[in-house]
Regions:
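Extracytoplasmic c-type cytochrome modules immediately beyond a signal peptide or single-pass transmembrane anchor
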Residues: 17-100, 107-119
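Sec-dependent bacterial lipoprotein signal peptides
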Residues: 1-15
């Protein structure tokens, strides 16, 4: 019984310990609203990708490239690579650019800038 009394509070706190989700988060996880960049991605990048719309994807990637946060090396290069792939209607290349940015930069971005609008 003692062990159960110790473990249950830890289990209840575990979701708040997610490194990508600060305890004082004001956006990004339900029931909170989407964060500014998350909202923009859902409204612009996702529909264009779902429709495989090369011109809209290229435009979205160009917007991302021109709004690279200071200190995020590679952000603009990844976005420009995505824009080039979109212009070539290379959806696999587009997805690779998305994955590259998410793998390299998303975790840090979520910790440092998730609640700040970029666009």
């Amino acid at each position: 019984m003692r062990r159960l009394l110790f473990v249950v509070p830890l289990l209840l706190l575990a979701p708040a310990c997610n490194e990508d989700s600060p305890a004082n988060a004001t956006c990004g996880k339900k029931p909170l609203p989407d964060c500014p960049t998350q909202k923009w991605m859902k409204e612009n990048m996702k529909p264009a990708l779902d429709q495989e719309n090369g011109p809209k994807l290229a435009q979205a990637f160009e917007t991302v490239a021109t709004h690279a946060p200071a200190g995020y090396a590679g952000w603009d290069a990844i976005a420009k690579k995505g824009a080039d792939a979109a212009r070539a209607n290379d959806i696999a290349g587009v997805k690779a650019a998305c994955k590259s940015c998410h793998d390299d930069l998303r975790s840090r971005f979520k910790k440092e800038l998730r609640d700040k609008p970029l666009f």
